[in-house]
């Protein structure tokens, strides 16, 4: 096993020696030091708020060489929400490189493509360092794609150093730098704040979209009507037009409905009784949540569909409209890309919600709705199944974990194979049902025009739920310090 990599059963494994090649680079990369003593809850809240403030400030800073007025934002709304990004700003790529690096490596380890014992502190440090290198590399790669493909328009009126090529290179460097800043900001929040910086940035982006969609008093089209739905409804009511006020509030109503359904689904679970084999009378319960794979499937499915849209735009601009042709607003107007693209939000549709209904309640509109829905739900189920099988969440892996902990299901032999057969009755079913459910819910939110998009709402509810749990745990540990020591 002295080779850097080897082949077993047609699978390529990377071992420690292969990753050790990157150790000199890992050693010189800046790292956020761990706190000398655990921060108090108050300090964690301060750090969290400071991180949020920096995130919002970065979203308002545009790179030198980019004219903010030329940036097209509308068609990238879903991408911004998923990646915690702001098109055209320093955080155009958002957390995309960080998330992609994490997903690639976790799937590689789970699928045994990388042979690495992460319980070993040295291996874990090496893995995290390599993940950081990959995230930095992806930051530059994505920045180059955004600039060279024309998604981020370069200001051609005053090229830097008199060269468009130099301007593009400088803009790409600034975009990559923005993602790297978010990478280290995430590291700061993980060690000094509450929860994960990545989750916080996504939730902040969705919350901002919800707030502006509901309460913005600025007109989107330059007219007298405010773009915020609440102000629109109030203006219609003042004019005696109650019906139009109802239509204006409809996306907000659907947002609340989707939010409540997700909150309810988060609490649905099956609890399997367990007992300790060596200690009779002591028992526990193993919860299998209905959303067993959380919102991971719909994130990956949405990312695939968004990449189809971006790839279609890139090919169309290159004179190869294989996936479809694109209109002046950089939105697909036909082809595969058109049918796999979410419908335009009622907020951006001429005539508001009534105009939106007039668009979708046609043969072409219905075909678009169901083609997009079928693709989103099918991909969600596929990714849900793949995620369970590749990340150690399948029946066999869970049964092995319970066996190592000395836990068994009462009334059955203490044999991992028996536990596996029992888990096989539940895990595959709830994986398919849960992944399909989040896909359908995201599709429903998209076609009804819910603010923040369906995927964004699903993400935010899950993130806020875990944020609340972390906050409550921190508060308990501060009140009872001995409990923290016992659990550690």
Predicted regions and their residues:
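Core subunits and conserved enzymes of cellular information-processing
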Residues: 5-488
């Amino acid at each position: 096993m002295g080779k850097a990599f080897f082949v077993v059963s047609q699978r390529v494994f990377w071992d420690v020696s292969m990753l050790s090649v990157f150790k000199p680079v890992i050693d010189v990369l800046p790292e956020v030091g761990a706190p000398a003593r655990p921060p108090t809850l108050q300090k964690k809240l301060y750090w969290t708020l400071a991180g949020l403030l920096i995130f919002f400030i970065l979203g308002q800073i545009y790179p030198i060489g980019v004219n903010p007025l030329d940036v097209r934002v509308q068609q990238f709304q879903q991408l911004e929400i998923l990646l915690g990004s702001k098109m055209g700003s320093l955080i155009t790529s958002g957390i995309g490189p960080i998330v992609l690096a994490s997903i690639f490596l976790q799937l590689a380890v789970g699928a045994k493509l990388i042979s690495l014992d992460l319980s070993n502190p040295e291996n874990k440090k090496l893995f995290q360092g390599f993940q950081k290198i990959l995230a930095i590399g992806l930051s530059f790669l994505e920045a180059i794609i955004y600039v060279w493909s024309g998604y981020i328009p370069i200001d051609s009126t005053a090229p830097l150093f008199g060269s468009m090529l130099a301007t593009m290179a400088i803009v790409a460097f600034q975009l990559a730098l923005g993602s790297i800043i978010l990478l280290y900001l995430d590291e700061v929040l993980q060690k000094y704040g509450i929860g994960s910086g990545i989750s916080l940035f996504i939730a902040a982006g969705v919350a901002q979209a919800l707030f502006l969609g509901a309460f913005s008093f600025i007109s989107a089209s330059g007219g007298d009507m405010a773009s915020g739905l609440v102000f629109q409804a109030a203006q219609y009511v003042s004019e005696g037009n109650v019906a139009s006020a109802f239509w204006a509030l409809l996306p907000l109503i659907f947002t609340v409905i989707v939010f409540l359904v997700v909150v309810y689904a988060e609490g649905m679970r099956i609890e399997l009784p367990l007992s300790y084999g060596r200690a009779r009378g002591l028992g526990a319960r193993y919860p299998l949540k209905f959303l067993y794979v959380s919102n991971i499937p719909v994130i990956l499915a949405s990312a695939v569909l968004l990449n189809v849209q971006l790839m279609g735009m890139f090919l169309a601009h290159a004179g190869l409209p294989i996936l479809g042709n694109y209109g002046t607003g950089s939105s697909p107007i036909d082809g595969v890309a058109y049918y796999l693209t979410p419908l335009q939000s009622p907020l951006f549709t001429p005539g508001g919600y009534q105009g939106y209904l007039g668009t979708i309640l046609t043969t072409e509109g219905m075909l678009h709705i169901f083609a997009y829905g079928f693709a989103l739900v099918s991909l969600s189920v596929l990714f849900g199944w793949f995620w369970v099988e590749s990340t150690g969440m399948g029946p066999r892996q869970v049964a092995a974990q319970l066996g190592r902990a000395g836990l068994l299901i009462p009334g059955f032999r203490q044999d991992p194979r028996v536990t596996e057969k029992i888990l096989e009755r539940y895990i595959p079913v709830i994986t398919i049902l849960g992944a399909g459910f989040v896909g359908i819910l995201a599709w429903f939110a998209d076609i009804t025009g819910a603010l923040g998009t369906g995927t964004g709402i699903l993400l935010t509810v899950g993130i806020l739920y875990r944020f609340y749990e972390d906050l409550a745990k921190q508060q308990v540990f501060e009140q009872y310090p001995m409990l923290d020591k016992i659990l550690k």
